[in-house]
């Protein structure tokens, strides 16, 4: 049955996101570059996979010196990707399949090729002279850190045309816009509207912490930046209800939550500090890195949601860890110097876990059940590999592997014409790892992800529930309870009458299919116990579940009844990197 778009304006709280690098997804016209029509061709696949919202990396016209994050013209789709009409068609076709689409929006900076910058640099008194930040010397704002430390020496760059320095937080070919100029604010708000008018469902806001600078500060998370975000949000709420703003703010939890404001800034923020700690926890085989950061994570304001991720198009960033933990991560995951990029590790998920299927499953099971909306990165559902011999972050941006045919089925262009070579090594190459093969193989990781997402979709507690970390005697075991009691069910909760929940469910029936069992009712679990073994060896665990005495425990994927909770001390054994999702009813 085709899915349709939910009308719930808070759809993003229960959605699963999928990040698409258009350039690398599917090439419809054989020029070696993925494009919007190619993505339209693959929507059926994404619908089958069960994702709810695509996040498109920047598609605007660009010299492509930073994957399109160097915008040359905000008003045009890059010719290699198609045209505005193609985007509108993509949005319509996706919506028809129940899939929403958000686009990356780079507000902080443009390319130095942008016509605004060309004008701005031409003299000190042209109409756009103050659209960027110009100074006679490069001594200003020394407290602001350099983000791309491995390639940039300063946040100031000399422009020989204007004979002045301009400010940039990323590459020197990406000058920062001057948000103290009200014309820049207005120009950006009209660009937002221009694209929302195509039917897009919102934006991932690139590099939001850096919009303003003030003397004596780090130039991050300033009150002026938050005021601008409130303005942006109110304009969107007024004209475009149901759209979402997802902030890319690589910050510590206490600064991060400020991007939700009082539910009047961004609807979502990526949880940057949690991500590296999931990798740390499985390597140390200890839950502490995860539980520590969750303890430091403030409550979400109403209507907000975390964006959770394992990998994305950038390096696995290590900005939000201590120096000691960064050394540990480099030693464990990035030993080869070619893997280090900026302040992180440019590798895909599968090579990071040494192609271990149980470990990839464990990490995804955590991703799908921790509080937030999961954001998948294209190709990770196949356990695709990377190519550390490519420059910058291209290691993780190679073509999607569709088939074992030429160019991995990504493009009919000559190999030499491809924007990047597809993987061809014996382990991760397209002949071994591709959608066609994994789709045919019911036991593949692709099918496992698809099934997990279908289970997750049936239980809104994963998107909406609170979390309580449980004390477990074994430090290698992470356990938490997710609970969600919608307003309408509070009467049931008060009387503690959960008995009816599983009525009619014949859990003893043995399924011969490899599929997880279908639920008899939708969204019935209001209390789910999630338990993970972070160690590569089998582990016992004892949980204090006294307050759930006499409740029924049912494994969620197979609907298999486990022993009821008796006097509180509940004993479980988990296989290597094993996990359970239990409903407690
Ligand atoms: C964050 C993006 O994710 C990254 O790819 C880009 O290089 C920087 N912002 C600069 O725009
Ligand atoms: Ca193309």
List the predicted regions and their residue ranges.
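Active-site and adjacent substrate-binding regions of carbohydrate-active enzymes
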Residues: 1-492, 498, 502-585
